[in-house]
Amino acid sequence: MTLTLNRQLLTSRQILVAFSGGLDSTVLLHQLVQWRTENPGGALRAIHVHHGLSANADAWVTHCENVCQQWQVPLVVERVQLAQEGLGIEAQARQARYQAFARTLLPGEVLVTAQHLDDQCETFLLALKRGSGPAGLSAMAEVSEFAGTRLIRPLLARTRGELAQWALAHGLRWIEDESNQDDSYDRNFLRLRVVPLLQQRWPHFAETTARSAALCAEQESLLDELLADDLAHCQSPQGTLQIVPMLAMSDARRAAIIRRWLAGQNAPMPSRDALVRIWQEVALAREDASPCLRLGAFEIRRYQSQLWWIKSVTGQSENIVPWQTWLQPLELPAGQGSVQLNAGGDIRPPRADEAVSVRFKAPGLLHIVGRNGGRKLKKIWQELGVPPWLRDTTPLLFYGETLIAAAGGFVTQEGVAEGENGISFVWQRNA
């Protein structure tokens, strides 16, 4: 068996390979070492993710270090901790792995993983069990976008048996994860109990399943093409989804548009029930309502006849964050990012006797630059078109008890720079 590298892989000279130390990734790394020999300008690194789920996890790290040392491949070991609630162990481990991959990738590097034909078959069956449509039944693509670069699966057309033959023929050593024998996990149940039975009855079942997945991917790609104009018409420059153009659409067409909009936000693919709730409970909620549908760590909200996909954040209206060293950036609570004061702008610097702080609400009537008369903060937010969920999380700059400016919003008359070197109040949000 030889590894036929995807042509898109050959355009990249920098590769990061996911290396668990198991059979599949060991064969992949072995063949990529050969690729490096044939392409002297190519750079190859490996990453091993230590989940801490097995008593053997430290021994696996040692094994991977020894293999990479033997093959002269730089190895990055990422230790991750899984959350104690929310997703199941399988989903948590996968999420943690791919977050580690994204953190480790260097500019210009592509990620290469060792999924093979049997994995593709299992992925298809899992999607079928969940009741997925063409997008889910497309299973895994040989090349896909990931973390601003590409994720490539060059073994996707090869069976697990072929990889085992290669490993034995070349005297490779690999680890066996004992959890792979635990059929309480859905994927293991399919691998150990279901797929062997199907393969016994239909020897080419994995190949035909992969063909069906490819046809689903083709249909999904065609839908993307046919709906591109509709999506562009419904989507605003800010990335929100306008409700009015979708009112006259059929249910199926509207659901397809919402799915593609969410995919563009890197959101998890919603179930059919979730799509119905997005439309009925959020888009069509009473005009005076502020509807919100939680989907994991994110929310779908409606504002100004548009759907918004936002990260869930706890309101900060009661928080006061002192900023004693205001020449340095200030970390905000609840993962809201950071703020800093930069040279150049319309805001006056604080006087020596003024304590600087960041707050998230301001009482009384406020007089802001560009507006006549005083207004309450709620009215200012409405006039500026600030969505309700941002109104108690947007950082407000205070000198003493005086509101000076809102990040990205306004400057008060008490905070305007006059005949002096002004500064700007910049909010750097977390992704």
From Swiss-Prot:
EC nos: 6.3.4.19
Gene3D superfamilies per UniProt: 1.20.59.20, HUPs (3.40.50.620)
Catalyzed reactions: cytidine(34) in tRNA(Ile2) + L-lysine + ATP = lysidine(34) in tRNA(Ile2) + AMP + diphosphate + H(+)
InterPro entries: Lysidine-tRNA-synth_C, Rossmann-like_a/b/a_fold, TilS/TtcA_N, tRNA_Ile_lys_synt, tRNA_Ile_lys_synt_N, tRNA_Ile_lys_synt_subst-bd
Keyword hit for tRNA processing: yes
Segment forming the signal sequence: none
Protein's cellular compartments: Cytoplasm
A GO MF label: tRNA(Ile)-lysidine synthase activity
Transmembrane regions listed in the UniProt entry: none
The family this protein is said to belong to: Belongs to the tRNA(Ile)-lysidine synthase family.
Cited NCBIfam families: lysidine_TilS_C, lysidine_TilS_N, PRK10660.1
Protein name: tRNA(Ile)-lysidine synthase
Organism of provenance: Escherichia coli O157:H7
Gene: tilS
